[in-house]
Structure formats: C-alpha cells, structure tokens
Regions:
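A short linear hydrophobic-aromatic micro-motif
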Residues: 38-44, 80-81
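Short, well-ordered beta-strand segments in beta-rich or mixed alpha/beta enzyme
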Residues: 5-9, 45-68
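An amphipathic, aromatic/His-enriched active-site/gating alpha helix that lines ligand/cofactor pockets
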Residues: 59-89
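Short S/T/G/P-rich N-terminal loop/turn motif that feeds into the first structured element of a domain
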Residues: 1-37, 47-50, 85-97
Length: 97
C-alpha cells in the first residue's frame, strides 16, 4: 500500500491543556479506525520545528488518505501538510540506468 506522511501544526488552543490534547488524539484515532479500517498506522512522532506532529500511515489509495487527513482536520485544532512517500528500493527502480 502507498505510504503517506502527515505533518500537523497545532493551534495554540489545542495545546493549552495537556489532558485535552490527549483526549483529542484518542478521539481522532478512534474516528480514523472506525471510518478507515483499511488504513495501517505506521508511526506517530512529536517533532521539533514548524510542525508539532508527524504521522505515517499506509492507505490503499489517495482517496482514503485524503479521508484520513480530512478527519484530522475536521476537529479544527491544526493545519496539515500531506506527502506521499516511496521506499528507497522502489525509487531506485525509476532512476535512469
């Protein structure tokens, strides 16, 4: 399945209460599991820099990936940027010989 990376920058309101942030994470994760059962979550990272979180997941197609991102954004607590990712060994196949 294709791999997607979502970078999320939280709003200041989202980080005011750590308990609320933990609750929000559980709610979003449950929503994704319920509405996108075919998605395989690979990793979640808190990151330093202009973004607060990096999520890596596999989805069967870009429509499903877009649905995951729309679920994340629907809670109104962050801005996202989404990338597709390709394992290096697959990328090497497309390099000129």
């Amino acid at each position: 399945m294709p791999t997607y990376i979502v970078l999320t920058r939280l709003t200041p309101e989202a980080v005011k209460t750590p308990g609320e942030l933990k609750r929000l994470e559980r709610v979003v994760a449950d929503h994704v599991r319920k509405d996108c059962p075919q998605v395989k979550w690979v990793a979640n990272y808190a990151i330093l820099g202009p973004y607060d979180y990096m999520d890596i997941f596999e989805a069967p197609d870009e429509t499903t990936a877009a649905k995951v991102v729309m679920i994340i954004r629907s809670y109104g607590h962050g801005q996202t940027e989404t990338w597709t990712a390709m394992p290096w060994e697959r990328f090497e196949i497309v390099l000129p010989h």
